[in-house]
């Protein structure tokens, strides 16, 4: 591990805010130098051994006082140069201007064991010039959610930022969890999150909105140089290729979300990664009964802009915002349309690929998409758990005596189950007919479905149970969840409880079905 050699390319290349203070202000440059605010009693709650290994941390270092001091913001390793990044964004469809890292401080980059440079950020590290009067801290509940979901998504095979550590600060902050006029003290924590880049769509939108074409161009050139080094060429041709790849990655990302039933909850353009990573875990969730209109975010309860079924369309809209921000760099902005068309084509291809895999087909034809959509309709009307429905289907054979027995654990409402039983049996007959002409051998079909349909997903009620235990000083559930989510596609003996459908007590419970951006 030693010596750690930190690189700081973002701040070495891009212009710095000349003012050195925490005063909230409009910043015209790309970043501001700012140090983390120390915390009173830091305590390591959890860490990811896989991320630590990638970053070349020795296992012994992870439990030392020095590690805890650094990743709580109380100290720095040599070579770290902390800073906060400036960006803007569209939130819930409206341009809101400058946002920036209001409670995130980047420490620098480390060269990983895989040959990739990774940025290390502390989320909840204290105020910055972008905090807009807030305290720059993060509560324990949201920090646990980000830590666990970062790692769970990675092991599901979904592009994501990662998490190195979760550290309690020993302090409390005041938060109004549901924005309903009931603020209360909550314990705070800091997550060290890790990614090759945290550049967002909003990074480019802000200078474009201000007419600062020089900074816009410098940001684009830097991002291509650092994050897309495989792209070659110059000028508009290079920019077109770059934007098209962003569109491709974003389409693949959202297709993965739809495959596993993940709902991001707050797909603002400042929460969209330029690398096509899942970023900024807030009021996210996994759908239970396949309701395309469901969102876990109470802030979005009326418009449901970021509901599960709308995520592909929202991603496309966000890419349109990015295209408009980049347009000043082009003599003919129409060339960006090819990238947007790339998104459509990539998403449709990924949708077909994933439908075939989830149903166990060798390939997906048009009528297979109709069959897939029909199953989604059945799941919704019968109130069936999406994860358990596909899991049961992977073990089904046409000669089973009771065709619905495979879904015994998937139903949330026995009345709806009985009412929709004829429709479900009809669907299974259609499915059996399709399987009879598919070339995949049975064993290969089962394996294909197993790899596409997770057994374990990070259901909100599981996370909430871990949060409530951790708030009382019990970390057993936190560590158990972290371990289970490392192998989401495998049967894990003794871990069956983590694969169960949402219990009835969690249907309308805060933290389980209702979340907010309060963190």
Swiss-Prot record:
The keyword Nucleotidyltransferase belongs to this UniProt entry's keyword annotation: yes
Catalyzed chemical reaction(s):
L-seryl-[protein] + ATP = 3-O-(5'-adenylyl)-L-seryl-[protein] + diphosphate; L-threonyl-[protein] + ATP = 3-O-(5'-adenylyl)-L-threonyl-[protein] + diphosphate; L-tyrosyl-[protein] + ATP = O-(5'-adenylyl)-L-tyrosyl-[protein] + diphosphate; L-histidyl-[protein] + UTP = N(tele)-(5'-uridylyl)-L-histidyl-[protein] + diphosphate
**This protein's UniProt keywords:** ATP-binding, Magnesium, Manganese, Metal-binding, Nucleotide-binding, Nucleotidyltransferase, Transferase
Keyword Plastid annotated: no
What Pfam families does this protein's entry cite? Answer: SelO
Top enzyme class, one word, equals transferase
The cofactors required by this protein are:
Mg(2+); Mn(2+)
Residues where Mg(2+) binds: 271, 280
- Recall the GO molecular function terms of this protein's record: AMPylase activity; ATP binding; magnesium ion binding
Catalytic residues?
A: 270
* Amino acids binding ATP: 100, 102-103, 123, 135-136, 193, 200, 280
Enzyme Commission numbers on file: 2.7.7.-, 2.7.7.108
Q: Which InterPro entries match?
A: SelO
* HAMAP family in the cross-refs: YdiU_SelO
- Its biological function? Nucleotidyltransferase involved in the post-translational modification of proteins. It can catalyze the addition of adenosine monophosphate (AMP) or uridine monophosphate (UMP) to a protein, resulting in modifications known as AMPylation and UMPylation.
Report the family membership. Belongs to the SELO family.
Q: What name appears for this protein in its UniProt entry?
A: Protein nucleotidyltransferase YdiU
Q: Whose protein is this, by species? A: Xylella fastidiosa (strain 9a5c)
**Record gene name:** ydiU
């Amino acid at each position: 591990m030693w010596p750690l050699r930190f690189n700081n390319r973002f701040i070495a290349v891009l212009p710095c805010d000349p003012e050195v203070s925490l005063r909230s202000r409009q910043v015209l440059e790309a970043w501001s130098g700012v140090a983390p605010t120390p915390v009173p009693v830091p305590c390591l709650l959890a860490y990811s051994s896989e991320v630590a290994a990638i970053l070349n941390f020795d296992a012994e270092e992870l439990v030392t006082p020095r590690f805890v001091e650094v990743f709580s913001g109380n100290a720095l390793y040599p070579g770290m140069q902390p800073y906060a990044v400036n960006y803007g964004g569209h939130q819930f469809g409206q341009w809101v201007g400058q946002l920036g890292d209001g409670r995130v401080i980047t420490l620098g980059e480390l060269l990983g064991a895989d040959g990739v440079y990774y940025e290390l950020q502390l989320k909840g590290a204290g105020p910055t010039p972008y905090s807009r009067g807030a305290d720059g801290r993060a509560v324990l509940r949201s920090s646990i959610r980000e830590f666990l979901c970062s790692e769970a998504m990675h092991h599901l095979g979904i592009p994501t930022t990662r998490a190195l550590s979760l550290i309690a600060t020993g302090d409390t902050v005041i938060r109004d969890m549901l924005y309903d006029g009931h603020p209360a003290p909550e314990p705070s924590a800091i997550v060290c999150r890790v990614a090759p880049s945290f550049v967002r769509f909003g990074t480019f939108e802000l200078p474009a909105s201000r007419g600062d074409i020089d900074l816009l161009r410098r940001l684009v050139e830097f991002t291509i140089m650092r994050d897309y080094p495989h792209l070659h060429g110059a000028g508009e041709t290079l920019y077109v290729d770059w934007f098209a790849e962003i569109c491709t990655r974003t389409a693949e990302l959202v297709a993965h979300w739809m495959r596993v039933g993940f709902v991001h909850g707050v797909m603002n353009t400042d929460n969209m990664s330029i690398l096509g990573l899942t970023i900024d875990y807030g009021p996210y969730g996994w759908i239970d009964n396949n309701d395309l209109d469901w969102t876990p975010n109470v802030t979005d309860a009326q418009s449901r802009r970021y509901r599960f079924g709308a995520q592909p369309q929202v991603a496309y809209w966000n890419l349109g915002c990015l295209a408009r921000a980049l347009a000043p760099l082009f003599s003919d902005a129409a060339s960006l349309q090819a990238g947007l068309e790339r998104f459509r084509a990539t998403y449709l291809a990924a949708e077909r690929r994933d439908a075939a895999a989830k149903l166990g087909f060798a390939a997906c034809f048009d009528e297979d998409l109709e069959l897939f959509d029909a199953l989604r309709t059945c799941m919704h009307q019968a109130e069936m758990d999406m994860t358990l429905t596909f899991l049961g289907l992977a073990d089904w054979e046409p000669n089973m005596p009771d065709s619905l027995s495979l879904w015994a654990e998937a139903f949330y409402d026995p009345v709806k189950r009985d009412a929709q039983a004829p429709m479900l049996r009809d669907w299974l007959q259609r499915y059996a007919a399709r399987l009879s002409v598919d070339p995949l051998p049975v064993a290969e079909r089962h394996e294909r479905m197993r790899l596409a349909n997770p057994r374990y997903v990070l259901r909100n009620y599981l996370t909430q149970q871990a949060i409530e235990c951790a708030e009382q000083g019990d970390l057993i559930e936190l560590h158990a969840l972290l371990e289970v989510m490392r192998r989401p596609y495998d049967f894990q003996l003794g871990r069956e409880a983590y694969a169960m459908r949402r219990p009835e007590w969690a249907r309308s419970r805060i933290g389980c079905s209702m979340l907010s951006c309060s963190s």
